[in-house]
Amino acid sequence: MTNGFNDIGFFGDDLDSWRDNVRAEFPESFAIADRMNRMGMRMIRDIPEGERPLSQGLALAGFYRALQSFQSAILLAERGALAEARALVRLCCEAVILVGGLLKVEGTVEKLNEDHEKHVLSMANSMIELNRQAKTGADLTPFESEVARVKAEYPEEQKPASLKWASMAAQAGLGRLFELSYRLPSGDGAHVTLSALHRHFDKDKEGEIVGMIFHPDKSDLQSTMLAANASLIHALGLVQEFMDLGQYEAEIRDLLLQWSVTRKELEHE
């Protein structure tokens, strides 16, 4: 049984050569990505242990999530699954915005809890409605109790609200990052939009559709890596500043110098 791309798609073991070629074609993008990833993993080990305010504990978890999403995005990007990589870049950016909010914007813990309670309320109401429609006879008391609890905490005129990512990004000084690494990937990667679907259309020089395609893609890998790297460099800076990692200050400054050069090269390619 063969295990190439034509047999099992992006699970194929013949994508190693594709990955090597992509990394050779875009060395600057992957060089700084690899450097930042190693720095992030070292930071995880070097962050001092001990009690922290809840906001910092949540921010640390957010950093873990951002780094994991970054690593996952790079794995997919180098294998040519760009739409999925861009979805993970957006998720990485979302985590970075939350980290920034938790560390720099008062009231973010409460907003995060409110967002959670909105989800709990929606899920409980959905389970009640689904069971009633299906006449399952299931005990709905746990769901009804959750609804009552949330409504008691948030009266009718003050229902729990979802997090507003654009607003939080602006408050945390991450407005430009939001546009680059959250809004743009949302349009052609994170959601099944018209732009995302057009990735599977083969077009001629005039832009006319001539067939369907399903294969590794590197068409906008440069912008994908730009958005991913921008997200992580902000995350590293926040963690270094707020998590007692003074020993990384010089390394962060040097990283920013490399990023200033790499970013300009990527933006003009």
Which residues make up each language-model segment?
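A cross-kingdom marker of C-terminal helix-rich interaction/assembly modules
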Residues: 1-269
